Amino acid sequence: MKTEQTPWWKKAVVYQIYPKSFNDTTGNGVGDLNGIIEKLDYLKTLQVDVLWLTPIYDSPQHDNGYDIRDYYSIYPEYGTMEDFERLVSEAHKRDLKVVMDLVVNHTSTEHKWFREAISSIDSPYRDFYIWKKPQENGSVPTNWESKFGGSAWELDEASGQYYLHLFDVTQADLNWENEEVRKHVYDMMHFWFEKGIDGFRLDVINLISKDQRFPNAEEGDGRSFYTDGPRVHEFLHEMNEKVFSHYDSMTVGEMSSTTVDHCIRYTNPDNKELDMTFSFHHLKVDYPNGEKWALAPFDFLKLKEILSDWQTGMHAGGGWNALFWCNHDQPRVVSRYGDDGAYRVKSAKMLATAIHMMQGTPYIYQGEELGMTNPKFTDISSYRDVESLNMYHAFKEKGMADQDITAILQAKSRDNSRTPVQWDATENGGFTTGTPWIPVAGNYREINAEAALRDQNSVFYHYQKLIQIRKMYDIVTEGTYEIIAKDDPNIFAYLRHGSNEKLLVINNFYGTEAAFTLPDSLAPDEWKAEVLLTNDEAREGLQNMTLRPYESIVYRLTKPC
């Protein structure tokens, strides 16, 4: 049971590992569990606290492991259950916790439950999934769309019924209305906790409760009928009661298209649901008119507004944010909101500071601490991601020019973050002695962990310092948030307020100089200013600054005694 006043995960920093692309010890081109064990000391040097592993369960890998075939076994290319147990043990020896990624909105259609369900309309497993008859005119049951394109319904010709798949056709949605499904899920969670894990990251968990009327969407893709659905809070409270309450664990829910109000309900400890949530609104400010697969500069003022609304809203409601720029589904942030050319190192540090000095639990995605960039693939044969390949074919059918398709995929593909971690300057960045499952980014000779560890001014050591500041100053965890100069077109500045101190965080998001003046009322002259961290040369005074391109500074302001 959680008894301590400040739960451990509020001061923790999480490192996300995408095992397939992390470190390969067998030479088969695919990362593995032993590869993670081999790099635990590197992660300890970074000073992170928690490792989150994206799915390592047995899977046909149509969606890189988010299509689970067997919840109780390890995907053979990653290793064995013994390897996993050794990973947990070796991590714990280094005071590193291990969080598993769990997908319970859907399973692979190769899962034994689905194979049983589709075998007969009378199967006891039929009701583990969501089946509907066609409409009277013979069309699909509803006009809901899959998030990977096309209808969310797939016909089972043998029975004449359709099953629901909000994602790929090989990912059938589970029926959470069925108590047996929920019991099986909770039993499986206990199995992994008994293996010694420290928590779960729950994939698209706010989609598990569907509106049982299954109405047609008047506009859009139908998401309003299953996002933050009618019974989702009931189900998560039950999950907490049956499972999480028995362990000193950390739980984080991935929330698709959610709201601040729902995330307060998910994470306020009084509700006993989850510990924290991921939301993605700040990663849609470069979607023109909400369209992911179109190119546009990011809307900086909108970015500041969204991050600030989540900071103030979640704090006021007693919720807790997961803080992040990157994951396995997003492009590399230095290519997206920074400058991956001349200002790569400086903008990567600035972006790190901007997110890490907020309230919440920060997440670092593998390679982010090195300032890894989008790979800028020029050939469709380099891509592996099902969503990207679907979009490529859709664009080709529309007659879009190849160079335009290339530009969109280079900016938007999920494969941007899935290229192998660049460990050193040897072939394939030291990731594998074989042929990597996806090409390594071409800049691995310049951008790699070995070079970063040798250079005290590297992005790596900037992340390390941010982690140290979080551990040293409670204000980072507990202070309130106030945005400054919210309409400034270049600078993202905010204050964190404590009882006798403040943190002033100033970030220039662009490659040009920008003037900044701190209002006197926010930091009176008699307050003492100390620079905790900068990505540039130190400067004197707080007034009338001209920030250099991508400059970032953290001041600690203290009241005189």
From Swiss-Prot:
| EC number of the protein | 3.2.1.93
Q: What pH dependence does Swiss-Prot or TrEMBL list here?
A: Optimum pH is 4.5.
Q: What does the record give as the active site?
A: D203 (nucleophile), E254 (proton donor)
> Which keywords does this Swiss-Prot/TrEMBL entry list?
Cytoplasm, Glycosidase, Hydrolase
Which species does the entry assign this protein to? Answer: Bacillus subtilis (strain 168)
The UniProt function text for this chain reads: Hydrolyzes trehalose-6-phosphate to glucose and glucose 6-phosphate. Can also very effectively hydrolyze p-nitrophenyl-alpha-D-glucopyranoside, but not lactose, maltose, sucrose or sucrose-6-phosphate. Trehalose is also hydrolyzed, but to a much smaller extent than trehalose-6-phosphate.
- Describe activity versus temperature: Optimum temperature is 37 degrees Celsius.
Enumerate the GO terms in the molecular function aspect.
alpha,alpha-phosphotrehalase activity; alpha-amylase activity
State the SMART domains in the record: Aamy
- Notes on how activity is controlled: Activity is stimulated by high salt concentrations with different efficiencies depending on the kind of salt. In vitro, inhibited by glucose.
Task: Give the reactions, separated by semicolons, that this protein catalyses.
Answer: alpha,alpha-trehalose 6-phosphate + H2O = D-glucose 6-phosphate + D-glucose
Q: Which GO terms describe its biological process?
A: oligosaccharide catabolic process; trehalose catabolic process
Question: What name is this protein filed under?
Answer: Trehalose-6-phosphate hydrolase
User: One GO CC annotation, please?
Assistant: cytoplasm
Show which residues form the site (Transition state stabilizer): D329
Domain of life, per lineage: Bacteria
